[in-house]
Amino acid sequence: MKTQTNTPNMETGSIPRLLMQLAVPAVVAQVINLLYNIVDRIYIGHIPGIGAAALTGVGLFAPILMLLNAFAMLVGSGGAPRAAIAMGKKDNNLAEKILGNCFTLLVGLAVVLTIVFYVSTPILLRLFGASDVTLTYASDYARIYILGSFFVLIVLGMNTFITTQGFARISMMTTVIGAVINIILDPIFIFVLGMGVKGAALATVLSQAVGAVWILRFLTGKKTLLRLKRSNMHLELKVFGPCLALGISTFVMLSTESLLSISFTSSLSRFGGDVAVGAMTIITSISQLVTLPLQGICQGGQPIISYNFGANKPDRVKKAFFTQFCTCIIYTSAFCLVVMFFPKAFAAIFTSDKELVTYASWALRIYMAGIFSIGFQVSCQQSFMALGQAKVSLLLACLRKIILLIPLIFILPNFFDNKVFAVFLAEPVSDIIAATVTTITFFTLFNSILKKDK
């Protein structure tokens, strides 16, 4: 068994310093990861003559992209905390079995999803609202991206196991390397080689492939604390079952983004037309600047909470949670204020169309009005995961999007003359309600969860 050189740090190190060491690289990685899609959209939106239609087409692929991410995190977000808890209990053998089983699951999922989505994507794109013009661009992008699904799942699903060991910088470099390659290749493939939308997809797949190689080399190398071994890749239900049970809440959160995207697009298309749908495409990208860094903060806090929970150190678990909690709230509150004051600056990144910039700026102020409360909800819900509370985490994951937001998108327009305003208003209403319920639930159960572990 390898010596856990990071154990003393997790058990005795300064909590704020640990969170900074683990969260900052994770946040940077999440922001850079966001560039994969944002850079594609910015470049595609500026393709001469076809930019608007091409951007719309690529946007229609978003629900499928979200589902691929959801399946990757089903394994990664559930397996990594389980591995961290095992490490906290000094059971590295179990932690390595979890790593091996999760890798096998990701490979299997990649094969199945590639086949299913490659065959069904044209039909799905039509259901999402693709026209004869936009379907061409959507299909061109989708087919190439889907063929690279294996690399996407490996990068998203296995990188969490690097972070959970305390190697946050290595984890960050996975994303940095891929994003830099993508940013360099995008203009070459799109403009220089004249590949257009196909070039954007190919650049993304190649950059993800390099990231996957980086991860696998590290996890099979000498520096890792948990090594990926063939002997641990044989699936055992008792090993991967608890991982999937824990990861299901993240899967639900991410997969419902797909349904949410379809709900917003269909309603806005009905009440506001193309300009409203275009504004939503911009808003979706900007909103990820809130949610992805939050995930990074919680990814940094998760190993600290999980490890000390497994090591039966409740005081350090509490301190880690409250440090993470306050950080999330400060970030979302600050972002909310910036968007309220400078919405046009954000909208103008994605388009030079004055009408769309004005419309998107108006919509942003409505949509983001409750974004400050997301810090409460995400921090508490993710902390339930870090503590191994899969059922509660799943319920709270369902609350905001499935129980509240999606129904409100269709209900609120019945009570307002401005139907588009009502559709956008559904977001802050659901944000605030979900955050209130989640925060109360967490603080009600937190102490009892810690006592049960004694």
List where the protein language model places each region.
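Transmembrane helical elements of multi-pass membrane transporters/channels
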Residues: 21-40, 144, 178, 207-211, ...
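Residue-level signal for transmembrane alpha-helical positions in Major Facilitator Superfamily
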Residues: 20, 35-36, 75, 116-120, ...
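Short runs within selected transmembrane alpha-helices of multi-pass transporters and secretion channels
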Residues: 145-163, 171-179, 200-213, 295-299, ...
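Short alpha-helical transmembrane segments in multi-pass integral membrane proteins
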Residues: 1-25, 83-150, 192-247, 305-370, ...
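Small-residue-rich hydrophobic transmembrane alpha-helices
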Residues: 55-115, 152-171, 279-343, 374-393
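N-terminal transmembrane alpha-helices
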Residues: 10-50, 63-78, 82, 107-114, ...
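Helix-terminus/linker motif at the lipid-water interface of multi-pass membrane proteins
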Residues: 31, 35-56, 125-132, 188-195, ...
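Small-residue hotspots at the loop-to-helix junctions and early N-terminal turns
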Residues: 52-63, 138-142, 201, 272-289, ...
